[in-house]
Regions:
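ER/secretory pathway lumenal C-terminal domains and tails of membrane proteins involved
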Residues: 1-7, 23-175
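Short periplasmic/luminal acceptor-recognition loop of GT-C membrane glycosyltransferases, typified by
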Residues: 8-22
Length: 175
């Protein structure tokens, strides 16, 4: 906790990693500005709801998807590749958040299901914020890329709720 930047987010994958950090924050008062996020719980809507509210001195996580898009009926988002090019993550979030029937796939049951129209996701890098926050040293600025690209495996046919929320977080986290 003490080695992180102010208002950092620590992502881990289990209770054995999470509970000692929470203990340090809640009982010993260590770095209450840092948000500890247990990725194995990020698939639960109640946990996403908790991450969306202020906790101690930690701001809410900047998720943009409305609750209706990650509740019990939306455990997965299908991948139907309409575009063979990178789509900005914020634009993908807007696509998923939309209730426009054109952004959904019809199912045999008659229901419509959200889907991602590309396997390639582009996440712009705010270089100035990365330098000002201390993530990147000013003398290394020339080494920074403008965009980080995520490529979803061609054998993967859907994203789980936790994967979708991680993309949402990356889309709205201004480095």
């Amino acid at each position: 906790l003490n080695s992180t930047l102010p208002n950092a987010i620590i992502m881990n994958y289990g209770d054995n990693d999470t509970f000692p950090l929470w203990y340090a924050q809640e009982v010993e008062g260590v770095r209450k500005d840092v948000r500890v996020m247990n990725m194995s719980s990020l698939g639960a809507e109640w946990y996403i709801d908790q991450m969306r509210i202020k906790s101690n001195d930690s701001d809410p996580l900047p998720f943009s998807l409305p609750r209706s898009k990650y509740t019990y009926r939306n455990e997965t988002v299908l991948i139907q590749e309409l575009f063979n090019r990178p789509i900005p993550a914020k634009q993908l979030n807007e696509w998923i958040a939309s209730e426009d029937p054109r952004t959904m796939l019809p199912m045999t049951s008659g229901e419509k299901m959200d889907f991602l129209p590309s396997r390639q996701i582009a996440i712009p890098v705010n270089k100035q914020n990365a330098i000002e926050s201390g993530i990147v040293k000013p003398e290394d600025a020339h080494l920074m890329v403008d965009t980080v690209y995520l490529n979803i495996n061609p054998n993967k046919h859907y994203l789980t709720r936790d994967e979708l929320m991680l993309i949402d977080l990356l889309a709205n986290f201004d480095w």
